[in-house]
Amino acid sequence: MALDETLFGYPIYPKFKLGEPRFPQDTFLGRYLHCLDVIDPRTLFASNKKLEESLELLNSFKAGTATNVPDKSLWEAQKLKSAILHPDTGEKVLPPFRMSGFVPFGWITVTGMLLPNPSWPTLLFWQWMNQSHNACVNYANRNATQPQPLSKYIGAYGAAVTAACSISGGLTYFIKKASSLPPTTRIIIQRFVPLPATSLASSLNVICMRWNELETGIQVYEKDTGKVVGVSKVAAKQAVTDTTMVRAFLPVPLLLMPPCIMPYLERFKWVTKTQVRHIFVNAIVCTLSFAVSLPVALALFPQESAISREQLEPELQQKTKNSLLYYNKGL
């Protein structure tokens, strides 16, 4: 691959900039291409040695001692660092809770939530599994500039899971009790129950798991110097709001596509001949839908978001002359 090759008009490996995304973040397409880097599952297989080599290369570049190193190598090193280490703490994120592990480790729960005609225990079990995974991902990818005690996150986890199971169980109960609906209509509607349940529950999950940020605020900084100006509750509100919108949108294509696609595939006898085959095909459709919807949802807002100085608290406005300040939105 030629290094000057372009992708949708963007250079695939532009001049390397330390700490900057490979693609522009002021357009949806640029953010989408960046998110494909963020969720690349190949980074899950990187060894500790490979990570150390990447960090050494980036440190050498920062010190000005990395000479004749291709931009591609520098971008790949930064991609690996961003995929594995938390941007605020610098600590490793466990593979199941990285964005690159969201689909490989989350497809099982998504498939389980979309199983046809689930029993009450099955329904609640998969909602619990899904929201437990979401809660761990939210915690692992939070803005960590203001440390919080683990006890607060445990309480938030309980609230998120309770909300998810209550919403899903409540919707299913009312549909089953809707005797005026024909049985076929009830079955079709029941296939789409996970959509509003998961969308609402995922939004509440983010709010619960990141409530402490709203109370204490998050750090805002000058992008050109990296100087931390202070801690802002206004920025925290914007960060949590944007992330909540992302999580509310994520289940829409993910949970709409399989119920729309599976009825057509079920016309083939090979698919419905055995329950194992049906579950297998359903799992493939769910996984592909998950892989398609995740980068689209993440690209709605940039991870490193900007906020105008005028929007911040008065005491912070006096500490900088920059018109825009930045913060880590979290994922």
Swiss-Prot record:
GO terms for biological process: amino acid transport; mitochondrial transmembrane transport. The chain crosses the membrane at residues 104-126, 153-175, 243-265, 278-300. Disulfide bonds: none annotated. Keywords: Amino-acid transport, Membrane, Mitochondrion, Mitochondrion inner membrane, Transmembrane, Transmembrane helix, Transport. The keyword Transport applies. The keyword Transmembrane applies. It holds the Pfam family SFXNs. One of its GO terms (cellular component) is mitochondrial inner membrane. Its main location: mitochondrion. PANTHER family: SIDEROFLEXIN, SIDEROFLEXIN-5. Mitochondrial amino-acid transporter. This is Sideroflexin-5. The lineage of its organism: Eukaryota, Metazoa, Ecdysozoa, Nematoda, Chromadorea. The gene is sfxn-5.
